[in-house]
Amino acid sequence: MNPNYLDFEQPIADLEAKIQELRKASTGPAVNVETEVRALRDKLRVRTAQIFRDLSAWQVSQLARHPQRPYTLDYINTICDEFHELAGDRAYADDKAIVGGLGRIDGRPVVIIGHQKGRDTKTKVARNFGMPRPEGYRKALRLMKLAERFRLPLLTFIDTPGAYPGIGAEERGQSEAIARNLLEMAELKIPVICTVIGEGGSGGALAIGVGDRTLMLEYGTYSVISPEGCASILWKDAAKAKDAAEQLGLTAKRLKGLGLVDKVIREPTGGAHRNPEQMGKRLKAVLLNELDALEKIPVDTLLQQRYERLRSYGAYEGH
């Protein structure tokens, strides 16, 4: 897959293009460009490290939305020995923006739920651009209860710009579906690990984001609103999204510092899309370590710790 470069990655794109040109020029028997290629590769490594060492919040937001970034099903295919998808909320419909089912990771049975985006126009529309409707969240709740019934740990993968705000979704109880999931997840008598793999957009993310551990990929984002939405509200100008991104504090590093994220998982140089296989292996190792720790904790203690964890985020005081 050819990389889809973001604007701030242009120096990287230029260097990689030069390397490709030299490779093509070296097809003749008398041409040896290995020395030049090695020099350019060294320069590429240094330049890439420089760029990704000092990313702004807006640049991280761009990476979180990268069209080649691995999605939930990509990670499932990488980390699971086997996976059986389950469909439908048993009330209205099957929402393709949420996927979930039963899987095994190194032989360990788990239930996995996650947001799912599309890659091309057809699948983007089918997945509703990763924005779930109420039936998606009710499908997720059905799988959560299934996990609890069979005492299987629950893994959720968060990657959505937000819950779908359409009229039909509101008529079918979008806010109730999200609120119900928040309540039920807080009381699940099983280990729950939530991982932000891309965008974490407001209540649409939180509806599968309450658990015992919150993990976040290095270039993921987690916020109450998108930078563009925030800029439109505060400054009546979506072009100020860069400023909004900084003010929102939506990066993994910032959220870890605030205590809202338990662990930040490092991504391959250039982002998860540059080496999805390596990213999947890193994610798998972290998930297994966290599961090992959580499964040793008695259920009553687990629930108490989860309650205290949620309360530690803060409380609203009326005036």
From Swiss-Prot:
User: Which UniProt key words apply to this protein?
Assistant: ATP-binding, Cytoplasm, Fatty acid biosynthesis, Fatty acid metabolism, Lipid biosynthesis, Lipid metabolism, Nucleotide-binding, Transferase
Query: What's the protein name?
Result: Acetyl-coenzyme A carboxylase carboxyl transferase subunit alpha
- Annotated pathway: Lipid metabolism; malonyl-CoA biosynthesis; malonyl-CoA from acetyl-CoA: step 1/1
Please name the GO terms that the record assigns under molecular function: acetyl-CoA carboxylase activity; ATP binding; carboxyl- or carbamoyltransferase activity
What is the protein's species of origin? Xanthomonas axonopodis pv. citri (strain 306)
Reactions that this protein is recorded to catalyse:
N(6)-carboxybiotinyl-L-lysyl-[protein] + acetyl-CoA = N(6)-biotinyl-L-lysyl-[protein] + malonyl-CoA
One GO location term (cellular component): acetyl-CoA carboxylase complex
Which family would the database say this protein is a member of?
Belongs to the AccA family.
- Location(s), subcellular: Cytoplasm
CoA carboxyltransferase C-terminal domain location? 32-293
Q: Which NCBIfam families match?
A: accA (TIGR00513), AccA_sub (NF041504), PRK05724.1 (NF004344)
Lineage, top ranks: Bacteria, Pseudomonadati, Pseudomonadota, Gammaproteobacteria, Lysobacterales
A UniProt-annotated Pfam family: ACCA
An example GO biological process term is: fatty acid biosynthetic process
Q: How does it assemble?
A: Acetyl-CoA carboxylase is a heterohexamer composed of biotin carboxyl carrier protein (AccB), biotin carboxylase (AccC) and two subunits each of ACCase subunit alpha (AccA) and ACCase subunit beta (AccD).
E.C. no: 2.1.3.15
What function does this protein fulfil? Component of the acetyl coenzyme A carboxylase (ACC) complex. First, biotin carboxylase catalyzes the carboxylation of biotin on its carrier protein (BCCP) and then the CO(2) group is transferred by the carboxyltransferase to acetyl-CoA to form malonyl-CoA.
